[in-house]
Amino acid sequence: LQFQIDDNTFWGIMHGDNSGYYEAFQILAGLYVYFGEKDRGAYWAHQADELKARANEVCWNGTFYTHFVKRTPITISGVDESKQLSLSNPMDVNRGLTDLKKAVSIIEEYRRRRETTAAFAEWFSIDPPFPDGIFGDKKLVQGAYVNGGIMPLVGGELARAAFENGFERYGVDILRRYWNLIGENQATYLWYFPNGAPASVETSTSPEAQSTDGWGSSAMLYALV
């Protein structure tokens, strides 16, 4: 795994980082206006609009946001990167990066993949995943954590996006499936393997794999309320 910037760093643009900045700029603009600094508020609102336009121009592939727009030319064999649907797409909707047409396109893509995937849910961290071992960590096999694991975090964001963009039945369906999932074991995990097996200390690349995940469950709760 690459935790530092050096001569071997692959540079590129990730859509989720940009939607996060967009949301932050909007919040900052609102705070400035609230405290009477309208000029600064207008400045950050303009920065948000400009970033949104650039992100959509660069990252949108016509159906969803490309996982990683490369600045460093490199080819990764064993996966069609143009088809990779990554976890921040529903977040992009909820952060306001999309218009209604793009939001609908993203939601419909998840619904399509639900019909074709062998996984128990369409809440992919990324789909299709990278080949086993590509990150230099033997635990990051296909279907594990951020390499194709099934994440309630994604499901919660997707449910919220569904409720806000005309797919209420789909949003309810996601919440019901999550309710059944946690009801079976009275536990919720950060991620699951596609076959439904939960994360464990032995299979996780994160420091802890607890049965009391708050990241995914809070996203589901946000969609519910």
Specify the residue positions occupied by each region the protein language model found.
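Aromatic- and acidic-residue-enriched carbohydrate-binding clefts of CAZyme catalytic domains
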Residues: 1-12
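A general structural signal for well-ordered alpha-helical packing
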Residues: 107, 155-156, 175, 221
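Catalytic cores of carbohydrate-active enzymes
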Residues: 10-14, 20-135, 175-210, 214
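Terminal, non-catalytic domain-edge segments
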Residues: 217-225
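Short, well-ordered coil↔helix boundary/capping segments
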Residues: 12-15, 145, 149-152, 214-215
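C-terminal substrate/ligand-recognition segments
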Residues: 141-168, 222-223
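Short, solvent-exposed loop/turn segments at the edges of secondary structure
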Residues: 1, 16, 85-88, 151-156, ...
